[in-house]
Amino acid sequence: MDYLPLFADIRQRPVLVVGGGEVAARKVALLKKAGAIIKIVAKNIHPELQILQENHEIEWLAKSFSPEQLDHVFLVIAATNDSLLNQQIYQAAEQRHRLVNVVDDQQKCSFIFPSIVDRAPITLALSSAGTSPVLVRMLREKLEALLPQSLGKMAEIAGKWRPRIKEKLPAIKDRRLFWEKAFNGLFAHKVASGDWESAEKTLAEQLEKDNPKQGEIILVGAGPGDAGLLTLRGLQALQQADIVLYDYLVSPAVLEMIRRDAQKICVGKRAGHHSVAQEETNRRLIEWAQQGKKVVRLKGGDPFIFGRGGEELQAAKQASIPFQVVPGITAASGAAAYAGIPLTHRDYSQNVVFITGHCQKDGNGLDWATLARPHQTLVIYMGVMNAGKISEALIKHGRKADTPVAIIAHATLPNQQILNGRLDQLESLAKQAETPALLIIGEVGGLQSDLSWFSSKTDKEDTKSSLINLA
């Protein structure tokens, strides 16, 4: 171990910063967050420091450094570009046994700053002892993704309740089990939802009676396919799940992010055949949640856009099961972005409409006259099977036959397929398309050749998420 990790309490302790530039301003911001009394020595100070000085939040002690300035400080930071001055500060600090950090000169540091993940009062510090800053940054990125923002509030409430829990449960084993149950159960869910009053009520109820463990259902949008597009909240839910029920549309890369010992069950749905009836899926969700499991329902895209997520939550509500929703990037946004097709554009499309292509077999359930209006973009989910009927109806109601169209299959993935053409060619294009696929109809489709940027090479070699690399 090259450095001893310490967490220093510098609240109301004097800290000297020599230097007044941008680097010094960054160090001051960190010290200020930790509650230090900050003294600055510099000829001139950065505008951010000027504001702090005018507000009496820092003290501009002097314009030049002298060793005596170290006599009454806890630690010193040298943030200048003057190597001789930095050497002088380092030697003076060492002689007085003051902790010193010379920015970007590790040989003149008795301490170094770690990379920080801040969920106060939970704080994680990472360091490679200066050997690999990029690796530390990647590790921090992974931890930032895995640790929910609510973690700090959870710790704060837990600290408030510690004396009461200790009085009620004197045995350390009982207290450990109590907190494990709380941090993995309804209490954590309430804190994450921002319902702090209810979270404390849950702790009180858990303490006063031996409640059976209560599970919950988390509806998670997996996004359009690229695992890098999964939200941080979605990743956290997958890492906490006991059971995950997922659809065919969820990519293997996203499934790889599920906690290793979680049970994974495919309840896949595809146009034309349903492997598991919706009622059976609802029943399973409720049954496992009632057994105290944390059940994740993982859906491609966004669960509230043609995902039947509302139906599943209605069933959970009726069964009095706690639930939460983690939205995802819907297929329309992901497919269009990766294809280089802006869904709206000031010159071509003033609105965008999302519809499903198989809700009514005869097509009579849709207002084709409205859908056929010019200067709007239609995004059609599950429309490949009825592509001929769709193009016929739109042309019949006034949409021009030469309106650009695109069919995008396997959107955002290395095997993404894009078929471009005209509205009157939609049926023939659909016969060539792989599935699942999305239809985009509108003048914006004509921009695809100019704005296309994504390729399988781009995905594999340039933009692969470091979260996946470190998984």
Curated annotation (Swiss-Prot):
State the Pfam families in the record: CysG_dimeriser (PF10414), NAD_binding_7 (PF13241), TP_methylase (PF00590)
Gene Ontology biological process: cobalamin biosynthetic process; methylation; siroheme biosynthetic process
Per the record, the domain of life is: Bacteria
Q: Mind telling me which InterPro entries this protein's record contains?
A: 4pyrrol_Mease (IPR000878), 4pyrrol_Methylase_sf (IPR035996), 4pyrrole_Mease_sub1 (IPR014777), 4pyrrole_Mease_sub2 (IPR014776), CobA/CysG_C (IPR006366), NAD(P)-bd_dom_sf (IPR036291), Siro_Cobalamin_biosynth (IPR050161), Sirohaem_synt_dimer_dom_sf (IPR037115)
Q: What is its EC number?
A: 2.1.1.107, 1.3.1.76, 4.99.1.4
Q: Name the chemical reaction catalysed here.
A: uroporphyrinogen III + 2 S-adenosyl-L-methionine = precorrin-2 + 2 S-adenosyl-L-homocysteine + H(+); precorrin-2 + NAD(+) = sirohydrochlorin + NADH + 2 H(+); siroheme + 2 H(+) = sirohydrochlorin + Fe(2+)
Quote the catalytic residue positions. Answer: D247, K269
Enumerate the residues binding S-adenosyl-L-methionine. Answer: P224, G300, G301, D302, I305, T330, A331, M382, A411
From the UniProt entry, list the residue stretches annotated as the region Uroporphyrinogen-III C-methyltransferase.
Answer: 215-471
Q: Name one GO molecular function term.
A: sirohydrochlorin ferrochelatase activity
Protein keywords: Cobalamin biosynthesis, Lyase, Methyltransferase, Multifunctional enzyme, NAD, Oxidoreductase, Phosphoprotein, Porphyrin biosynthesis, S-adenosyl-L-methionine, Transferase
UniProt modified residues of type Phosphoserine? S128
Q: Could you say which protein family the record assigns here?
A: In the N-terminal section; belongs to the precorrin-2 dehydrogenase / sirohydrochlorin ferrochelatase family. In the C-terminal section; belongs to the precorrin methyltransferase family.
Briefly, what is this protein's role? Then it catalyzes the NAD-dependent ring dehydrogenation of precorrin-2 to yield sirohydrochlorin. Finally, it catalyzes the ferrochelation of sirohydrochlorin to yield siroheme.
Q: Which PANTHER family match?
A: SIROHEME SYNTHASE, SIROHEME SYNTHASE-RELATED
Name-wise, this protein is: Siroheme synthase
Native organism: Zymomonas mobilis subsp. mobilis (strain ATCC 31821 / ZM4 / CP4)
Query: What is this protein's gene name?
Result: cysG
